[in-house]
């Protein structure tokens, strides 16, 4: 249904996919790519990055590359688990020639996120997860945020998109687009 909705609206999307799903249902990859969409990595089993080592993550990147014929250039951490303890992921992504990440939530929540973070795409590094690093080689697309009753929160997906009124998410999309930023939405 998502593919059909995107086709109807003449737009494309990036699908951050868990590798084991593509192993079990390889036709999903074909459908995504045949319709002009992008495939990106979301780990092999939806593991929190804190549960992985760099070596295990590198193996997962290789496995995903085999499954997708090297189509993936982007990554999003499950449960937005990129943090100072898992910053090694940035180097692993660069080692495997990834171009971008979209794991940073630019507002602190009880579960994840960062305060004092860039809102626009920026160059991320393992030493700077929240601010542009001119020497960084990986582009970060932070998650979309917005205000609800004066409180800043993620508005692009998950619990928040189910909890917040639709107009709150639509306003966030509009605000991001006014600043020429991509509205990073997840379902």
Model-predicted regions and their roles:
Residues 9-88, 98-99, 103-111, 115, ...:
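Metal-dependent polysaccharide deacetylase catalytic core of the NodB/CE4 family, i.e.
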Residues 1-4:
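N-terminal regions that are enriched for targeting/export leaders
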Residues 77-181, 185:
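Active-site-adjacent pocket scaffolds in enzyme catalytic domains
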């Amino acid at each position: 249904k998502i593919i059909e909705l995107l086709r109807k609206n003449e737009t494309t999307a990036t699908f951050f996919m868990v590798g084991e799903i593509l192993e079990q249902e390889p036709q999903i990859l074909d459908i995504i790519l045949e319709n002009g969409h992008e495939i990106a990595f979301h780990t092999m089993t939806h593991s929190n990055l804190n549960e992985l080592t760099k070596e295990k993550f590198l193996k997962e990147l290789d496995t995903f590359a085999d499954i997708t014929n090297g189509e993936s250039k982007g990554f999003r951490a499950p449960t937005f688990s990129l943090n100072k303890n898992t910053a090694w992921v940035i180097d692993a992504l660069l080692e495997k020639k990834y171009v971008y990440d979209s794991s940073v939530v630019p507002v602190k929540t009880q579960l994840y996120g960062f305060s004092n973070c860039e809102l626009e795409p920026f160059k991320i590094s393992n030493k700077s997860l929240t601010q542009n690093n001119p020497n960084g080689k990986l582009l970060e697309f932070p998650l979309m945020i917005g205000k609800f009753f004066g409180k800043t929160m993620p508005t692009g997906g998950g619990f928040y998109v189910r909890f917040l009124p639709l107009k709150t998410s639509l306003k966030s999309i509009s605000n991001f687009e006014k600043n020429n930023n991509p509205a990073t939405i997840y379902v």
